[in-house]
Regions:
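C-terminal motif of bacterial Sec signal peptides marking the signal peptidase cleavage site
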Residues: 16-17
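Signature of short aromatic-glycine-proline-rich micro-motifs recurring in repeat-based ectodomains
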Residues: 40, 86, 175-182
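Positively charged n-region of N-terminal signal peptides that target proteins for export
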Residues: 1-5
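Asp-box/BNR beta-propeller loop motif
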Residues: 23-38, 56-80, 103-121, 148-168
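Short loop/turn segments immediately following the C-termini of beta-strands
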Residues: 55, 101-103, 140-143, 188
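Repeated scaffold domains used in trafficking and secretory/extracellular systems
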Residues: 40-42, 83-89, 122-128
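Entry beta-strands of beta-propeller and related beta-repeat scaffolds
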Residues: 49-50, 95-97, 133-137, 189
Length: 189
């Protein structure tokens, strides 16, 4: 998907998700960012801002009312010059979390690594928070178990759940490359 197509779809999503009492007589769609090299894999909207995580290690955001100004959160590249390939993104009231795919899996909080996991098959697919302190990230099957990490301290530290907490996991079962769409938090649970 090209960057231009993404932003046309994003604008359409923003307009279609708003509640409008009056009939719309016209619609003007304006591109926010046109870049054929961008690969956006995760989108979050909060407080009138649109955040997106890219495959080239960037988290971009813009205010819906000021879409001509796009800002970028810079991420340290400290792991053998590996550019993080972000597949998932989560927001709390004050923090932005982005998680990379592949080995090593890197979880960033506001641009700093807060969790790192190395394994030839490591691949985290999705991350979400159900409040400002508690969150979850899920990933593919490694070492005969699905991958789930949890935070209870606002994302400062993350703990991988032991396989014994899961029952009846089938061989190679997991969450699999759904680009940040395989967790849904309902009513703070």
């Amino acid at each position: 998907m090209t960057r231009q197509t993404f932003f046309y779809l994003l604008i359409l999503l923003v307009f279609s998700s708003c509640s409008i009492d009056s009939e719309i007589s016209s619609l003007k769609i304006s591109p926010v960012l046109i870049d054929s090299n961008i690969n956006i894999r995760a989108i979050e909207i909060k407080n009138n801002k649109v955040y997106s995580a890219t495959s080239n290690g960037s988290v971009l955001y813009f205010d819906i009312d000021k879409s001509d100004v796009i800002s970028e959160i810079n991420y340290e590249i400290e792991n053998d010059s590996i550019v993080p390939n972000f597949r998932s993104l989560a927001l709390t009231e004050n923090d932005v979390f982005a998680m990379s795919i592949g080995d090593p899996a890197l979880l960033y909080k506001n641009g700093n690594v807060v969790y790192k996991e190395t394994h030839p098959k490591v691949f985290y697919d999705s991350i979400e928070f159900w409040n400002d302190n508690e969150g979850i990230a899920v990933g593919d099957y490694t070492d005969n178990c699905i991958s789930v990490i949890i935070t209870r301290d606002g994302g400062e530290s993350w703990n991988k759940l032991d396989c014994s907490v899961f029952s009846n996991i089938k061989d190679s079962e997991g969450f699999f490359a759904a680009s940040d769409t395989n967790i849904s938090i309902i009513d703070n649970y």
